[in-house]
């Protein structure tokens, strides 16, 4: 039986007759307990238990020490299906629904306890309080700040403050969702957010509640919100607007949920998020970086983090002021997150150096990691900095363990107790007869590996890695990565370079064989992981040859285990790009420019000399597509329309999804590569985005015959009105014709001369604006355009009369949409202008059908604007009163009846009811239009 199977069976056996109370009390088995039962090394048992967690067979409970329980046992005792998204939990009590932690009473204001509450966080805390208290259900919030600045912690403090203030009930849910996990799978994203119905897609074996449902009555924290694709943002703001949703595959009834959203991003929200989504998140809160915090706050943060480490060690720390100085000025690219990592490294060094001391762990300059120590020693500002820090700490400061209550508790990031790990390894290595010096060197290099690997797990950067791994190790690791990919026929992501380079670096610095596996276990590893072992042997030869060191067999076994453990890691999949153009080097030149400027991308060039046959081109493009496809499809940028005709044949031949854009230019290639590398969009979204961005370039191309076509917009000043008119005309043109038509704006001053110059180059289809130039083309005045008839005239001028628009609203009314949306975007906070306009246009069509009238655009705009703001006032709870003192006549009563009856379905759709007085105002507009009077 394999080692992993022995461990799994032992774990199951330990709980086969256990009760739920017993399980909740002991929370599973630790790796040490299983190791003692099976007489194996604890590190090997821990390794296999984590493999079982990854394979969804065992649950990890992140207590101290970490404990494990088989999924099968948990499902049996809890009498419910275990959610496979929850393979690592903090406490089994939470799953039982009886968590004391979730229902505790919070007696102290959690926000005021934060370091910087009266300093750098004062404004952020004030904003958070205002957002929580805002009636009726609080304002959604967006937290802005660099990586590691504490956005997640701040979101959790807001949640605790809401409970403390009795805005949320004790035990209200606080759900965290990282948008980066599902950015490239809209269907799975929809399922995660809103749940799904059994059978709604492949793999949906049962009904599942989404996060919106789980967060009902509480807070949903959405981290890395900039990674949420546009489709996901639209799903979300529809829910924010209406409060209702359907599970995926469900249509029979609407579900409702009351959720306060807290979003977080490191990016500029105006460029990373849809404007329509941003309007739904009215409260933006900036979380300061470490650099933006005062020295006093940075000292307090360092003291707090040292106190947390003292709690984990269960001893007092004696910290020299130079250690404070070095730590406070060591965190550059990681903010508070890196400061925490550095504090852990210093404490680990100090712990190892003071293993034989019972009371106090001394932290001095000797305990600083080399990179921090070198930076500290090379600084010319040390005396000045130490003097400033001495105002807050003594030359030597005694720090006692900090025992937090739930209102101040920071989640532990590491799934193991670092100091327990050090003690375990020291004991093991002492049994092997190693000297204290060798043990220290071995332990410290491995501690760096553990702490640094956690800190950098989200974003690999070579420059960061170079601070603690030699460049020649990184270069060798890159070669080994290529070998592993070829031998194992799989693709590793960049983290492979990180983990393997750290391991090799640790081995080279240890310089001695550390053998803690017995013969039986090494034989099992060889037999179980044959392919990985073969690759590890190749690695051995390469490393020996390059670094001129001997690699013992036990190190090959460790390499085998490492390769196996990271084999499943994958790089984020991206859309591939093919640039195909006629000529000997046209496509290659464009691709070369793009890769040089924007870095590595799944892109390939296909140069097509004019002598190459179509069948050869097809084969060549198909082969290149297979090379660049990462499973997300391929965008094909071509120079001629004839190549675009190959799309369906290529899809059939390769099985790869393809989108094609013609008239490729270097600028277009750069735009596509930028979007693939940095925006995390799917194939369809990138295709649409590139097409949209370059349509203006195509429109500037001259017509195939005769002059270019144009509409001329005439305004008095050529400023704001001209821009709005240009936007409206652009929309009309896009709806009416695929032919490039230019929109030219001129001032009514010197109009005659301007028109003469335009006529030399353009065929003027129509003029629109404040003054008629009296030329041989139809003119549409602003009044006619706004009233509604002008839109029809312009479309007829464009199409030479071939389009006949209906008078109803089933056809999109461009003028009404443009003018209303422009205003509503500025002033609506809670409602989605686009959806509101669609809904109200549909409603007004019903009203017109019922009354047998056709309202002009001025009336439509007036009613839409008033009704949209009336719905907004319902949310804000400040409706306006109808103050007319005269008696309401029969005509107005009739309009009130029509208004109430026709508007009712839309009120139900939004879950909002407009007041009777607001409806009187709307009815009065109808009465004036139909009967010519109000009373």
UniProtKB/Swiss-Prot annotation:
Q: From what superkingdom does this record's organism come?
A: Bacteria
For this protein, the record's Pfam families field holds:
EIIA-man (PF03610), PRD (PF00874), Sigma54_activat (PF00158)
- Gene Ontology CC: one annotated term: membrane
Record-annotated PRD domain positions: 468-573, 831-935
Name the GO terms of the biological process aspect: phosphoenolpyruvate-dependent sugar phosphotransferase system; positive regulation of DNA-templated transcription
Family, as annotated = Belongs to the transcriptional antiterminator BglG family.
Query: Which protein are we looking at?
Result: Transcriptional regulatory protein LevR
Q: Which organism is it from?
A: Bacillus subtilis (strain 168)
Q: What is the lineage of its organism?
A: Bacteria, Bacillati, Bacillota, Bacilli, Bacillales
